[in-house]
Amino acid sequence: QALGLFEDENGDENMSSDMTTVNSGGVTSAEGFSAGAIFAGIKTAGADKRDIGLLLSDRPCTVAGTFSQNSVLSPSVTLSKAVVDGGGDVRGVIANSGVANCAVGEQGLIDAREASALAAEKLGVSSDEVLIASTGVIGVELPMALMREHIPQIALGDNDGDEFAAAI
């Protein structure tokens, strides 16, 4: 009931119709979410560029995902899919752009795990509560030196959803 759920005449659980619409909202529009991003140098520099973003929920979230059906998946997709398929709660997301972390062999999985762990440490959550998303050039490994340097510097804010979006 607190979530606006109700059972209809068939006993199916549905959302209440008295929901609030948020126009021009973002990932931090909902209460309890904060985000931030930084330019780490993964992409070409620009005044409005960000290439690593973090998203945090102040409480565990139940998640669902739609993933690529391509036979070649990046380790970032594989890790996030495992978290979602495992049914565990999620509290954070790390997203990077500029490098897809795809078609890079075993190093891609090592790097995706480390990036998730770095994000988890910064967010104060467990690494199995973090999803990772990478987009960009295929065949290039995550630049872990840049990620190690810049992830701890990301400042999170309740109104920084646009910053996070710019990093995707």
Give residue ranges: language-model regions.
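Glycine-rich, mobile lid/loop segments that gate access to catalytic sites or pores
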Residues: 113-168
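Short coil/turn connectors at secondary-structure junctions
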Residues: 48-51, 73-74, 87-92, 125-129, ...
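N-terminal amphipathic/basic leader segments beginning at the initiator methionine
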Residues: 11, 15-70
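Alpha-helical support elements that line or immediately flank enzyme active sites
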Residues: 94-124
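Short, Lys/Arg-enriched N-terminal segments with co-localized hydrophobic residues
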Residues: 2-14
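Short beta-strand segments
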Residues: 55-56, 94-96, 132-134
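Short acidic, glycine/serine/threonine-rich loops at helix termini
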Residues: 66, 105-108, 141-146
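Glycine-rich oxoanion-binding loops at beta->alpha junctions
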Residues: 62, 67-87
